[in-house]
Structures are given as C-alpha cells and as structure tokens.
Amino acid sequence: MGVRNHRLLLLRHGETAWSTLGRHTGGTEVELTDTGRTQAELAGQLLGELELDDPIVICSPRRRTLDTAKLAGLTVNEVTGLLAEWDYGSYEGLTTPQIRESEPDWLVWTHGCPAGESVAQVNDRADSAVALALEHMSSRDVLFVSHGHFSRAVITRWVQLPLAEGSRFAMPTASIGICGFEHGVRQLAVLGLTGHPQPIAAG
C-alpha cells in the first residue's frame, strides 16, 4: 500500500468558552468546556469506527488540542507548532463583528491579521502540513489534532485551492474531516463528521 491508499484525518478540538462566543482563539490557552470534553470523547468513538491504518497522531501544542486528543483516547506521537491555530495578532479574543466595526469587509481568509499571520504565511504553513502528511501516508494514515481555521486551511490546500476558499468549508468543534485520493486526485472525502449534534451557524 502506498500514499494513495492512506488518509489524512483532521480533528478539531472540542468546545471552549471562547469558541461558543465566536472569539478568535490563537495562542491563548483556554480550557475545554464540559460539553467540549464530551465532544472529544464522542470523537474518539467515531475514530475507532474508521478502521485507521496504524495512524500517526500529530497535535498542536495548545492545551485544548492536547486535552481533546487525550479524551479521544489517542496516543500523540508528535506535538508541533506547525498545526497551531492562525496567529490572530491584534484580533486575538475578538469576534468578527467586533473586528468589522473598524474594518467592515474583514475576513481572515482574505485579510489576515495585523501583528499576526498573513494569508500568505498561513498558506505556506498549511502547505508544509500537507507535505508532512504525505511523507507519512506512504505507509500509514495520518491524524492531525488542530484548530478550526488551520484545519480548514489544510483542507483547502490539500485540494489545491487558493487559501481564500477555506471560507467555504465548515469545521465544527470536535468534528472530523477526511482527506484522501480518488484515481490519483486529492479529494475531500468527508467533512464535519461528529458524534454530537451541531447547530448550523448563522451569517
């Protein structure tokens, strides 16, 4: 079996108090809520049903991702800042409506963040994450435990779209995305797989 027979899975961390409010959470350490902890456990049950092939688990260094991995019953093989969330810089802790009070058309996918990461920087980091996954996929499945925006960035670059198209993918808390190949073409096979109900976000 080779790289085209294996999968890249992405697991977003469970719910936090900031994620429920839509606050941009990059490097700030926030704990999972009780709901988030349950979500992580349910995600672990789902992963157990996916018949993964000797998966290597690579995790962001943030506490919320490490706790999600532990609650999901995963053994983390590598912790790396490569999978950290978008650095929101001056916008850390703010919601999109708050940011748009001063920059009406702002979208992280097209504008980036002052004093944080630009779109180009996240694009390059996502490409590096995809390359890392492909290195391991020659012999096994790969599971990234990461964050909402960065997981969407990886998915976008996996399917070789411009990073701005990441705005079109949803990644609810503790949800799973699965990337793979069909006839040699990189594809997104599954998105938003959860073991818990998720409301549809408005606007």
Swiss-Prot record:
Gluconeogenesis is critical to M.tuberculosis ability to establish infection and is necessary for its survival in the host. The record marks 147 as: Transition state stabilizer. Gene3D superfamilies: Phosphoglycerate mutase-like. In contrast to classical FBPases, is resistant to inhibition by lithium. It comes from Mycobacterium tuberculosis (strain ATCC 25618 / H37Rv). Keywords: Carbohydrate metabolism, Gluconeogenesis, Hydrolase. Optimum pH is 5.4 for phosphatase activity using pNPP as the substrate. One of its GO terms (molecular function) is acid phosphatase activity. Homodimer. It is an enzyme of class 3 (hydrolase). GO terms for biological process: gluconeogenesis; regulation of phosphorelay signal transduction system. Coiled coil: none annotated. Disruption phenotype: Cells lacking both glpX and gpm2 grow as well as wild-type on glucose, but are unable to grow on any of the gluconeogenic carbon sources tested (glycerol, acetate and butyrate); the growth defect on gluconeogenic carbon sources is fully complemented by restoring expression of either GlpX or Gpm2. This double mutant lacks detectable FBPase activity and accumulates FBP. It is also severely attenuated in a mouse model of infection, as it fails to replicate in mouse lungs during the first 10 days of infection and begins to die thereafter. This is Acid phosphatase. The active site is at 13 (tele-phosphohistidine intermediate), 85 (proton donor/acceptor). It catalyses: a phosphate monoester + H2O = an alcohol + phosphate; beta-D-fructose 1,6-bisphosphate + H2O = beta-D-fructose 6-phosphate + phosphate. Belongs to the phosphoglycerate mutase family. Its EC number is 3.1.3.2, 3.1.3.11. CDD domains: HP_PGM_like. The lineage of its organism: Bacteria, Bacillati, Actinomycetota, Actinomycetes, Mycobacteriales. Phosphatase with a broad specificity. Can dephosphorylate a variety of substrates including phosphorylated sugars like fructose-6-phosphate (F6P). Is able to function in vivo as a fructose-1,6-bisphosphatase (FBPase) and to maintain gluconeogenesis when the classical FBPase GlpX is absent. Shows negligible phosphoglycerate mutase activity. Has no phosphatase activity against 3-phosphoglycerate, 2,3-bisphosphoglycerate, or hydrophobic substrates such as alpha-napthyl phosphate. InterPro entries: His_Pase_superF_clade-1, His_PPase_superfam, PGM_Phosphatase. Pathway: Carbohydrate biosynthesis; gluconeogenesis.
